[in-house]
């Protein structure tokens, strides 16, 4: 099924390359709708892995150990899907190397490319380093793919010196990846904020986008954990405490997200600048009111009602809230992109009009989600989704703490 969706998306992209960008609606006043929406959305959920995992590592949260790898894998595959949207809206993707050879430093797009490239390489490294001990374990126990695991394990023998070097490398990457991750979505927001388009030209977009990215990333991680828990029988590792703690973190981010959303719209309303008020009105009570209030319901009302109470902050409850958040955050990206572009700021510009996605955009959107799921499934088949050596290390630490506590009590 996933391969069929991906194949159809590839067929539609080939059709776009043959017929030109006109089949993607690029001759309409409002365009790049789904491509740009999906770009921002996937870059956002990529924060599920490296950023959340790095913060939990640095704070030495013991409950993080079983979930870090599942989170870090989301980052890598989400980044691949996000950057693919750059190819979709190029009429000549084979010439993409030209801007790399002749970059324009004043263009926010070049900084986008630079930040995302560094983030992708850093995320792959951050995913790979903790995999090495488990790859060595697979090398010794899996005859079918031993050649692959032998090559990837880099001669790991588990000596104290190797463990010390690995811990130092992981610690360095955990510190380095946090500012990189924050810079990525900040620079993504500047693609909008550096323009004079109504309700894009805003100084609040940087932190607003970062908060939204972490928010949607946590939701994506919770859904992935629930599916993996059921599909691969990982109940002993993905326990209710993990869903409870991540649910509380998601509730905190929901409140932060509402604060930034309110601050953005309040300043526009109070400023009473005609072009921006036209966009604001379209969101609150006009053409975009339905997706806007659906977004508010999905991103705040539903998580607040479910995650505020321990009785409903269960595995099922957190998954329902996470699904609502992902829907709401996709709608938020859609509203940001489309509502502002639908209202011209000058009489010399187009006469506006509502955006309507083309078939090729819908097909490529479905193909991206299918490809993301397929890559994640393949990764789960080839590599352990739970860091075996880290879980064992955590169990050993817990046992030593219990023995120390017992000895002190006897004294």
Feature annotation, model-predicted:
Residues 1-13, 61-63, 101-295, 306-307, ...:
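Long, contiguous internal "core" modules enriched in hydrophobic/ aromatic residues
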Residues 39-47, 111-125, 289-300, 357-375:
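Hydrophobic alpha-helical transmembrane segments
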Residues 14-15, 86-98, 128, 132:
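Transmembrane alpha-helix boundary signature
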Residues 95-103, 275-279, 340-354:
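Membrane-interfacial helical/loop segments at transmembrane boundaries in membrane proteins
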Residues 299-303, 313-411:
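TerminUS-proximal long segments
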Residues 1-48, 373, 377, 390, ...:
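N-terminal signal-anchor module of multipass membrane proteins
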Residues 32-94:
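Membrane helical hairpin/interfacial module
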């Amino acid at each position: 099924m996933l391969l069929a969706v991906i194949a159809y998306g590839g067929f539609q992209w080939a059709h776009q390359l043959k017929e030109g960008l006109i089949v993607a609606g690029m001759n309409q006043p409002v365009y790049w709708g789904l491509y740009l929406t999906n770009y921002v959305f996937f870059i956002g959920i990529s924060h599920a892995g490296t950023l959340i995992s790095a913060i939990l590592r640095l704070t030495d949260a013991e409950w993080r150990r079983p979930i870090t790898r599942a989170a870090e894998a989301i980052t890598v595959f989400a980044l691949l899907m996000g950057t693919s949207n750059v190819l979709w809206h190029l009429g000549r993707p084979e010439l993409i190397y030209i801007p790399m050879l002749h970059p324009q430093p004043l263009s926010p797009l070049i900084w986008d490319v630079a930040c995302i490239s560094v983030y992708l390489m850093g995320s792959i490294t951050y995913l790979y380093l903790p995999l090495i001990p488990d790859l060595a374990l697979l090398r010794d126990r899996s005859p079918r793919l031993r050649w692959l695991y032998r090559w990837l394990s880099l001669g790991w023998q588990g000596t104290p010196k190797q463990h010390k070097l690995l811990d130092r490398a992981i610690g360095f990457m955990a510190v380095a990846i946090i500012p990189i991750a924050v810079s990525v979505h900040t620079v993504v927001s500047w693609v909008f904020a550096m323009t004079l388009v109504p309700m894009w030209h805003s100084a609040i977009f940087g932190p607003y986008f970062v908060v939204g990215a972490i928010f949607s990333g946590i939701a994506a991680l919770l859904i992935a954990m629930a599916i993996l828990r059921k599909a691969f029988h990982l109940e002993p590792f993905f326990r209710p405490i993990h869903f409870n703690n991540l649910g509380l973190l998601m509730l905190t981010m929901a409140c932060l997200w509402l604060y930034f959303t309110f601050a953005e719209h309040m300043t526009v309303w109070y400023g009473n600048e005609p072009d921006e008020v036209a966009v604001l009105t379209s969101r609150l009570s006009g053409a975009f009111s339905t997706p806007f209030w659906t977004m508010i319901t999905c991103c705040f009302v539903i998580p607040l009602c479910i995650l505020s109470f321990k009785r409903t902050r269960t595995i099922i409850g957190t998954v329902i809230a996470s699904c609502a958040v992902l829907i709401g955050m996709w709608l938020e990206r859609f509203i940001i992109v489309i509502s502002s572009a639908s209202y011209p700021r000058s009489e010399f510009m187009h006469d506006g009009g509502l955006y309507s996605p083309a078939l090729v955009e819908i097909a490529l959107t479905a193909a991206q989600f299918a490809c993301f799921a397929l890559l994640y499934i393949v990764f789960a088949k080839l590599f352990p989704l739970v860091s075996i050596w880290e879980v064992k290390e955590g169990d050993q630490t817990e046992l030593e703490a219990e023995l120390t506590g017992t000895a002190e009590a006897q004294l």
